[in-house]
Amino acid sequence: KEGYAMDHEGCKFSCFIRPSGFCDGYCKTHLKASSGYCAWPACYCYGVPSNIKVWDYATNKC
């Protein structure tokens, strides 16, 4: 699956002030995804395993 990475509060994980390539590494390391990029202003991940939670508009608390 794919989607936005979340922080510890369930909000989209911001990449606004992160260096280039940060989201790819973050998605691979923290979400076990195949890749990711900064879809300004948040990290978007591809190839996320089905058991890993990603941000969902329906359950958004931010």
UniProtKB/Swiss-Prot annotation:
What is an example of a Pfam family matching this protein? Toxin_3
Q: Which InterPro entries does the record match to this protein? A: LCN-type_CS_alpha_beta_dom, Scorpion_toxin-like, Scorpion_toxin-like_sf, Scorpion_toxinL, Scorpion_toxinL/defensin
Q: Which PROSITE patterns match?
A: LCN_CSAB
State one molecular function term (GO): toxin activity
Cell compartment(s), UniProt: Secreted
Which SUPFAM superfamilies does the UniProt entry name for this protein? Scorpion toxin-like
Q: What is known of its domains?
A: Has the structural arrangement of an alpha-helix connected to antiparallel beta-sheets by disulfide bonds (CS-alpha/beta).
Disulfide bridge partners, by residue number: C11-C62, C15-C38, C23-C43, C27-C45
Q: Domain LCN-type CS-alpha/beta, which positions?
A: 1-62
What role does it play?
Beta toxins bind voltage-independently at site-4 of sodium channels (Nav) and shift the voltage of activation toward more negative potentials thereby affecting sodium channel activation and promoting spontaneous and repetitive firing. This toxin is active against both mammals and insects.
- For whether the record's keyword set contains Coiled coil, the answer is no
- Protein name, please? Toxin Tb2-II
**Biological process (GO) annotations?**
defense response
- What protein family is recorded? Belongs to the long (4 C-C) scorpion toxin superfamily. Sodium channel inhibitor family. Beta subfamily.
**Keywords, ordered alphabetically:** Disulfide bond, Ion channel impairing toxin, Neurotoxin, Secreted, Toxin, Voltage-gated sodium channel impairing toxin
Q: Which GO terms describe its cellular component?
A: extracellular region
Q: What Gene3D superfamilies does the annotation carry?
A: Knottin, scorpion toxin-like
Question: What is this protein's tissue specificity according to the annotation?
Answer: Expressed by the venom gland.
